[in-house]
Amino acid sequence: MFIVGLTGGIGSGKSAASQWFEKQGIQVVDADIVAREVVDVGQPALKEIATAFGDWVLQADGSLNRRALREHIFQSPESRHTLEAITHPIIRKSIIEQLNAATSPYVILVSPLLFETNQHELTDRNLLIDASEEIQIARASQRDGQSIQQIQKIIAAQMPRAEKQQRADDIVLNDGHLKHLYQQLIALHENYLNH
């Protein structure tokens, strides 16, 4: 199976790109969705997180208080490493299972931390959806309702844009309209079909 890693910073347009690929009949494995699934109520990772951090990470219904944990880990690199040590191996295992089950001509692995978590090792080619930091902030603040400061912290915690550009095999600049994004994806889709 030919696997294309799709990455980009917050607000870059990863979701728009992955949805476009899905409309072309290409299966998509989304690392963010997998990351949410592995910490659902009843999953072993959730219990490990509560043990490591305390019950304050749980909401009244027993689910993960994502916002509180996110704010905590962006203030504490040590806590972020603890969380990653718990979740990343479980996430990777689930991603591999889903990639192996794919039946489309190729499969997309969407991951905002494709390079940071070494998920690029699972791929044959890597596509960066790129946007300027100003556009990332504008899109993410509109979409998520987060403050500019929170978004800047997320951007700062991710691999620098220039490094992602160096590591990517393909780069799509998404500073404009969706139509422009889709036009760029058409050519890449054809290339991926003919891998």
UniProtKB/Swiss-Prot annotation:
GO molecular function: ATP binding; dephospho-CoA kinase activity
Function field: Catalyzes the phosphorylation of the 3'-hydroxyl group of dephosphocoenzyme A to form coenzyme A.
Pathway(s) served: Cofactor biosynthesis; coenzyme A biosynthesis; CoA from (R)-pantothenate: step 5/5
HAMAP family for the chain: Dephospho_CoA_kinase
Keyword annotations of the record: ATP-binding, Coenzyme A biosynthesis, Cytoplasm, Kinase, Nucleotide-binding, Transferase
Disulfide links within the chain: none
Catalytic reaction equation(s): 3'-dephospho-CoA + ATP = ADP + CoA + H(+)
Ranges where the DPCK domain occurs: 3-195
Cell location: Cytoplasm
Binding site for ATP: G11, S12, G13, K14, S15, A16
Family, similarity comment: Belongs to the CoaE family.
Protein name from the UniProt record: Dephospho-CoA kinase
Main location (coarse class): cytoplasm
GO annotation terms (biological process): coenzyme A biosynthetic process
One Pfam family this sequence matches: CoaE
Organism annotation: Acinetobacter baylyi (strain ATCC 33305 / BD413 / ADP1)
EC number: 2.7.1.24
GO CC term, one of those recorded: cytoplasm
